[in-house]
Amino acid sequence: MEAIEAARRVVAQGSTAREQGRSLGAAAKDKIRELYDLKVQQYDAAGALARWDEIVAGAAPLMERFTPHTLEELRGQAEGAGMDEHALLRLATEYEISMDLRGNVSGGKCTGLLSHRLMHRPGVQVIGQNNDENPAVWADGKLDIIVEHRAPPATADDHSGEGGRPLDCVLYTHPGIPAYMGLNSKGLGVTWFYIDDSASERATTAGLPTCVLLRELLTFPSALAAAAWLRSVPRAVPNAYMLADPIQSFEIECTPSRWAATAHPPPEDVSLARPVSLTPGAELYGGFHANHFTVDLENVGNDAGDPHA
């Protein structure tokens, strides 16, 4: 088990996003190339390479404007792996081309939870999710990696506490894809869940890719800052997100044009998120997003969990 975990762990070091990306690309280049070749083979067989490139063409200028950290990291990965930048942009938009090809998809996908203590040292206790995908299209998971992003210590004259350095973080992902879920050094946890269905809108060539959003969210110092940013940027496809730092949690469902969220404690901007419904005297608030129901949620009253689930 230790050997398996060591093989999955990659450390990306550097004082800038570009340097960290270059370090990551060099360390994981064989896995990145293997996954890229696999995905090209899959989408070529589906006759979808041209459509994939259309999605890349739409995403690239949006990344320049809205996700500069992630784009710089991606460029560094390309350099470190000795690959073309376009290949890494393709991997960054893999989820969007996969959704494009699936058409109307419903049910299944990931499940997650968070626990927030309300009394006796209140604060978020845990946030997490599973990754519920078809292993067959991801090399049976053997390429998946845990990435530790590390910046050098701040200098003595760094009065900001960060000095423009990237926040340290640990994240799970497929090699070459910016992020799937993670936790940064400010204690911000980022998770996401599928909510797309036949009635949902998509903007796959006019919005930021999901895995790019996830990586950029991990550059923010708080759940509040991350949620406000996520609401402000163009989003390619519908998703649900759970964001939590040590004192505040957000549960979000959004499409390219619509936004619904709850938060505890609620933000001053009530348009960003409404308060969660709490039981008087409760010591814990538990939120979850479930795509695999084992009970009839319409008939179990208010105890089924979060209303966004």
Predicted regions and their residues:
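Gly/Pro-rich turn-and-neighbor structural signature
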Residues: E79, M83-G128
